[in-house]
């Protein structure tokens, strides 16, 4: 810690450290290692490598303000190393960040869910092994309802649940589902859709044929998907 502290004073029985020089080091870490707000290189199910959008909520960054406090406390305690875990922050439901201890697979790890909007298909991975592969129906293909691309994370899980929102005409809806795993603050998530009749791969292209943004799953597989997922697990939508 000492090499990034440029000035220290002692007043009224307290140490005061200038941790401003640490900001450039934190910037370096955030630019080279942190994952929040960045696109990811991701290998899809067929081996092709894509670049995700940077619009997702998955990832972490180090807070300069909080890191300065941690460095000060570390120096006062005369320690040589510091744990930055408490200095990271995230976006959305989990403000503490996600994936901080994950370095494999470009920071995504080996346990995740991936959804191809073009293929209308989802894959669920556990420790690098695909445990479920299933067709889905995503949000209707328009600016108001399309499922947002990016790398997100499972915020929490509920069984059962009631999903509430507005239809395109402004009317309210309340849909009962057995399995609910949201991954965006705007209300997109995985859930069973017992009311759906059209499960074709073209359903989302028709007007009103897709969902309001969620990943609709057939009731026959929704339960397995729910149990394969876990809180904070990455969700790649591409």
Please provide the spans of the model-predicted regions.
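Exported/periplasmic cell-wall-interacting domains
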Residues: 23-24, 38, 165-238
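Surface-exposed, secretory/extracytoplasmic low-complexity segments enriched in Ser/Thr/Asn/Gly/Pro
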Residues: 1-175, 179, 229-231, 236-237
């Amino acid at each position: 810690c000492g090499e990034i502290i440029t000035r220290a004073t002692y007043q009224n029985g307290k140490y005061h450290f200038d941790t401003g020089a640490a900001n450039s080091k934190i910037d370096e870490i955030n630019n080279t290692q942190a994952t929040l707000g960045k696109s990811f290189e991701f290998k899809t199910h067929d081996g092709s490598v894509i670049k995700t959008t940077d619009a997702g909520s998955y990832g972490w960054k180090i807070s300069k303000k909080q890191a300065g406090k941690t460095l000060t406390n570390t120096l006062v305690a005369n320690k040589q190393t510091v744990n930055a875990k408490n200095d990271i922050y995230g976006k959305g439901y989990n403000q503490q960040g996600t994936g901080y201890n994950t370095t494999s697979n470009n920071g995504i790890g080996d346990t995740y869910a991936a959804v191809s909007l073009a293929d209308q298909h989802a894959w669920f991975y556990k420790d690098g092994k695909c445990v479920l592969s299933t067709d889905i129906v995503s949000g209707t293909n328009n600016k108001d309802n399309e499922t947002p691309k990016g790398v997100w994370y499972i915020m929490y899980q509920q069984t059962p649940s009631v999903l509430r929102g507005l239809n395109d005409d402004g009317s309210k809806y309340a849909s009962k589902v057995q399995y609910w795993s949201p991954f965006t603050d705007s209300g997109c998530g995985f859930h069973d859709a017992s009311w759906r009749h059209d499960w074709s791969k073209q359903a989302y292209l028709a007007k009103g044929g897709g969902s309001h943004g969620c990943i609709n799953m057939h009731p026959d597989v929704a339960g397995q998907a729910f149990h394969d997922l876990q809180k904070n697990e990455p969700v790649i939508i591409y």
